[in-house]
UniProtKB/Swiss-Prot annotation:
Topology versus the membrane: Multi-pass membrane protein
Residues at which Cu cation binds: H151, C188, C192, H196
Location of this chain's protein in the cell: Cell membrane
Listed EC numbers: 1.9.3.-
The name this protein goes by in its record: Heme-copper oxidase subunit 2
An example Gene Ontology biological process: ATP synthesis coupled electron transport
InterPro entries: CcO_II, CcO_II-like_C, Copper_CuA, Cupredoxin, Cyt_c_oxidase_su2
Xref: PROSITE patterns: COX2 (PS00078), COX2_CUA (PS50857)
TM ranges: 13-33, 72-92
Primary enzyme class: oxidoreductase
GO cellular component assignments: plasma membrane
Gene Ontology MF annotations: copper ion binding; cytochrome-c oxidase activity
Species of provenance: Aeropyrum pernix (strain ATCC 700893 / DSM 11879 / JCM 9820 / NBRC 100138 / K1)
Amino acid sequence: MDVIPTEAIWWRLFLLFTAVGVLAAGTVTAFFIYSLFKYRSSGQALGEDQGTAGRIYRIMVESPVSGKSKYLLFVTGIIVMGLIVATIDETLYLEKSPPVEDALVVMVIGFQFGWQFEYSVGGETVTTLNYLVVPSDTLIEFRVTSRDVFHAFGIPEFKNKIDAIPGILNSMWIKTPDEPGKVYNAYCYELCGIGHSLMVGKVIVVDKEEFYNAYNSGPDVFSEYVNNVISKYK
């Protein structure tokens, strides 16, 4: 099953809202420019309340539901409803668990002032601090909590973040890039104390086959592998 990366979903929404905004702004601007020429002064005296201001007043106040007004209200309603439906649809997609069963599950525990990452390997837990090694071209499900105060875990490039709350397990997912070698920063997005600005983790993307060779070899081999990878970036 093809999975849309989280960042692509947010960019798609951003471009949709931008396109609608540009279209609306262009339409309004064109109307104003048209009005400047259409209703410019002709040099002839007009009767009381017979000018453009009077016509606009009658359209907007005395006859707010004229034919044109109804049409504009209808079109505006369709556009707004379309944006609402698109936003809800994309947000619900992001909030679901990864749509495939073979996602790599990583436990993320926030603390003042760092991140603890846990892999389940062969029934045992392999732990790293502030450095996370993940395979390329893979869905990663983060199960996020905190052991002290409120935090929020997020990786800017993937346009996704989730609250880390003591006693509550939240989840979010990302799809790593196809090519290994990328390194991303993971930040805390919740003011959590004096060391908040220093609470930055590293997410290192490695070759998928190499990662799973170590992962499937047991906790000892995998722990040595991730520590060797991490040592290159410290």
